């Protein structure tokens, strides 16, 4: 989503519908040309994104490599100092993780990344169509008092998945979960297996 990140940063979200229209037009034209690849626009954008400069500040890359889970906490008013004190005390124990406070540029980068990453699974499916069967997408809500919130799939199910992407809403236990399924597996059957697991956990979907 580096191209999406830069596009929104420099052009703005108000022009996104025009971008999507242009992508759709390019794909329609490409379908009429036998030498053009499937999902032309996605593959073209992914290719051009490799020529773009690094879009994230180094500290975000460091945290990406260091930690599996990341939380964007946006505070205002008196809550800023309250959060600052709480996080300082909580992460005094380094085994619990770490945090950093954003200036305006870092905050913008974090929010743009949050927006751009939402289409990551779709882009991956288009670019790696030979390895990907499809995407299983679930919106789930766990119990409010659920402490074991991170999903652990059984190996026989996990082995059918190339990548898992989780996007959550802090403190309400609502998640959007994208599963990129390996080529050759039945996505409907996999989804049914996942829903059975969610039923056992008392989740809603």
Predicted regions located by residue number:
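Conserved glycine-rich FAD pyrophosphate-binding loop
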Residues: 3-205
């Amino acid at each position: 989503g580096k191209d999406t990140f830069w596009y929104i940063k420099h052009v703005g979200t108000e022009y996104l519908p025009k971008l999507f229209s242009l992508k759709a037009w390019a794909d329609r034209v490409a379908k009429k040309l036998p030498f053009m690849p499937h999902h032309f626009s996605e593959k073209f954008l992914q290719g051009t994104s490799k020529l773009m400069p690094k879009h994230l500040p180094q500290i975000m890359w460091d945290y990406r490599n260091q930690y599996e889970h990341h939380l964007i906490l946006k505070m205002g008013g008196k809550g800023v100092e309250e959060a600052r004190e709480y996080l300082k005390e909580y992460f005094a124990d380094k085994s619990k993780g770490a945090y950093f406070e954003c200036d305006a540029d870092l905050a913008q980068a974090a929010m743009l990344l949050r927006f751009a990453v939402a289409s990551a699974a779709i882009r991956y499916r288009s670019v790696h169509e030979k390895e990907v069967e499809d995407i299983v997408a679930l919106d789930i809500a766990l119990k409010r008092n659920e402490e074991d919130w991170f999903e652990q799939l059984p190996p026989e199910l996990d082995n059918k998945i190339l990548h898992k992407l989780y996007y959550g809403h802090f403190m309400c236990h609502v998640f959007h979960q994208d599963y990129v399924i390996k080529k050759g597996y039945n996505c409907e059957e996999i989804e049914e297996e996942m829903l059975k697991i969610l039923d056992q956990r008392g989740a809603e979907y």
